[in-house]
Every structure is written in C-alpha cells, then in structure tokens.
C-alpha cells in the first residue's frame, strides 16, 4: 500500500508529539512559550506545560525549537 505523503510541518509536529519532546515556541510578537505538543491541526497547536494547556494559532508562530535533538527520518538513523 502506498504511503501517504506528509508535509514537513505535520511530520515535525507529529514527531515531537509522539516523542513528547519539550519545545520552545517563539511567537511573532516576541513571546516565548515552552511545553509539549499534545495535539495540532491545520490552524493551531495545543501546548501543555505544568498541567495547563495553551491553544496557539499557527499564524502567530515565528519559530519552533525542540529542547533536544530529534530524528524525523529513518535515513538519519543509518547516518548516525
């Protein structure tokens, strides 16, 4: 069965969600948010920290930095 193509944004967010990697999200207004992605869709990201959830609209996000190195592609395993 052919594998459905996934865009890079969805692949990245799904990887950090599954691996529960802590992120720092910088918004376009300069605000810095940290937490773990619990869910996302085409328009927003649900971020959880200290038992509280924040719904962040993607159009407000400037940069997302994972708190640790992450592997998104199987070929990265072989290269390491």
Swiss-Prot record:
Annotated PROSITE patterns: SM (PS52002)
Domain annotation Sm: ranges: 10-70
Disulfides per UniProt: none
Function according to Swiss-Prot or TrEMBL: RNA chaperone that binds small regulatory RNA (sRNAs) and mRNAs to facilitate mRNA translational regulation in response to envelope stress, environmental stress and changes in metabolite concentrations. Also binds with high specificity to tRNAs.
One Gene Ontology cellular component: cytosol
Record keywords, A-Z: RNA-binding, Stress response
This protein's name: RNA-binding protein Hfq
Gene: hfq
Entry keyword Cytoplasm: no
Keyword RNA-binding (UniProt): yes
């Amino acid at each position: 069965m052919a594998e459905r193509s996934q865009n890079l944004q969805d692949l990245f967010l799904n990887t950090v969600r599954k691996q529960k990697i802590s992120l720092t999200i910088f918004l376009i207004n300069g605000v810095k948010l940290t937490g773990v992605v619990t869910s996302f869709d085409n328009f927003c990201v649900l971020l959880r920290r200290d038992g509280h959830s924040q719904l962040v609209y993607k159009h407000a996000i400037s940069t997302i930095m994972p708190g640790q190195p992450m592997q998104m592609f199987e070929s990265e395993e072989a290269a390491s």
